[in-house]
Design a protein with these regions (language model features):
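Conserved RNA-binding domains used in RNP assembly and mRNA/RNA metabolism
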Residues: 1-102
Length: 102
């Protein structure tokens, strides 16, 4: 399950918790990305950039000290889809709705 993490540094990370590397002191996160707010064009909504948390590592799981995690939340569907696109995962399509005409 993809989760959002806010760190004591103010960074927001998105990734998948990894139970195999999580300990009492460390939270393992698979493919963590830092969310970077980016100013769009004037009058347009702000955009979110996705950047690898530690771009120069070959490791797929990064361990973060639990003491440095302020909170953990569930991202909205748009954020999940954007993360899946950035990590090469299949994007979950929205649930189909049936429309009937009377």
């Amino acid at each position: 399950m993809i989760r959002l993490f806010r760190l004591t540094t103010g960074e927001d990370l998105i990734g998948t918790p990894d139970q195999d590397t999580t300990t009492d002191d460390f939270q393992g996160i698979k493919q963590p990305f830092v969310l970077i707010p980016m100013q769009g064009e004037p009058g347009k909504p702000m955009k979110i950039g996705f950047h690898p948390y530690i771009p120069y590592t070959q490791d797929k799981v990064i361990k973060i000290k639990k003491a440095n995690i302020i909170t953990e939340t569930t991202p909205d569907n748009n954020m999940i889809n954007a993360y899946q696109q950035n990590t090469g995962q299949l994007v979950t399509p929205p649930k189909a709705k049936i429309i009937t005409w009377l």
